[in-house]
Amino acid sequence: MSNYKILHTSDWHIGKKIENFSILKEQKNFLYFLLEFIKKENIDLLLVAGDVYDSKRPGFEEQRLVNNFFYELSFTSCKWCVVISGNHDKKDYLSINKKLLSRFNFFLITEYDSDEQIVLLKDNGNLKFIVVCLPHINERLILGQNFDNIFGLEDQYSSKLFLENLENAYREKISNLSNFLENKYKGIPKILMAHSFFGSSKKIDTLGGSYIIPFNVFGNGFSYVALGHIHKFMKLRDNIVYSGSPMQYSFNETCDKYINVLHFNDNKLILQEAFPVPIFNKLIFAKGSLNEVLDFLANSKKEESFTIYLKIELNEAVDTSAEESIYDLARLNFMNLVSISYSLPSSQDLQDDSNFIGELEVLEMDEKYFFEKKLRWDFENGVIRDIKFKEEELISLFNEVLANGYLGEYEDK
């Protein structure tokens, strides 16, 4: 009887910043947790479904952190590790790991169409798992150059034709792979990894310029589908799962994060367990009046187990001394204050009579126009107070900086 444990994770985004705050320390804590979890649970296979890095050009510290993790992984119970690239990854940087870990069963797949995209995992010479890898690819490249002049036209038939062909291309590729593997390796568990948007609709759809592929393109030929790209833990079907990101990376994300552990027994998936990831950072958005925000900060508990990043939106204008009070209270509670913004009831006064600045106006007006318009509104509504410069002096100073800036005199300042 053979038992194996598989851990599915994705979207680490190592090197990610919360505004200007580095969270590399928190990400290091996550990777330490993950390594210890793998040791404790005796994980046999680690699947990382894309976006290891946040930038296509990660810095030295980010690369060292990732490389050290995979190096340490090679000394654990983990027999294999399979990683695919996401839309944030660049294969050149990920490939460093591949060279470092050649002695370890480390498989890195960065090409959508490649002989390496079918990974055969063996234990003592016996084939145990097959992992099919579909790293992220710009969907428009899937169909080649034939649709370059079709996509983007306003003609409804052209865009509909593109979407139908894109869905069919996904479906055909996955179906061909599934049928080939089933005929050649019958009875061996097959896992598919992909990094893209998939949804529960029956037909392909678009949202904000992104394509949402129906998950039914996966068919029924895989024991498990390990997905990356969406930061929320989500099951499209019981065996089609987004593991989500391990940490909160935006203020509209929940801080509930998971890693998914699969239990295989005699080539069958018998159990899935979603283990919560400890909170290493928390992003909080606080909105209200000055007094409400100050009360919130005064009553907040100091957290030592994780780092807090705070965004504040005030519904009333305050002076700089009030903003300083907010910053001071945040610091006392070990909170990183990302920004203070305003959502004022009279903000429509900033807009022109048509209620919105028209497209023509945006094209015709320059930086001076928008600076003067915003500055005048700030003076009239009390956002700017207690400064030694008059409105006219600030405008004159801005014009000077703008002129010198164009000449490059402020480039190093």
Swiss-Prot record:
UniProt KW Signal keyword: no
Free-text function comment from the UniProt entry: SbcCD cleaves DNA hairpin structures. These structures can inhibit DNA replication and are intermediates in certain DNA recombination reactions. The complex acts as a 3'->5' double strand exonuclease that can open hairpins. It also has a 5' single-strand endonuclease activity.
SUPFAM superfamilies linked to this entry: Metallo-dependent phosphatases (SSF56300)
Quaternary state and interactors: Heterodimer of SbcC and SbcD.
The family this protein is said to belong to: Belongs to the SbcD family.
One Pfam assignment: Metallophos
CDD domains per UniProt: MPP_Mre11_N
Name of the featured protein: Nuclease SbcCD subunit D
GO MF term list: 3'-5' exonuclease activity; endonuclease activity
GO BP terms: DNA metabolic process
Keyword annotations of the record: Exonuclease, Hydrolase, Nuclease
Nuclease found in the keyword field: yes
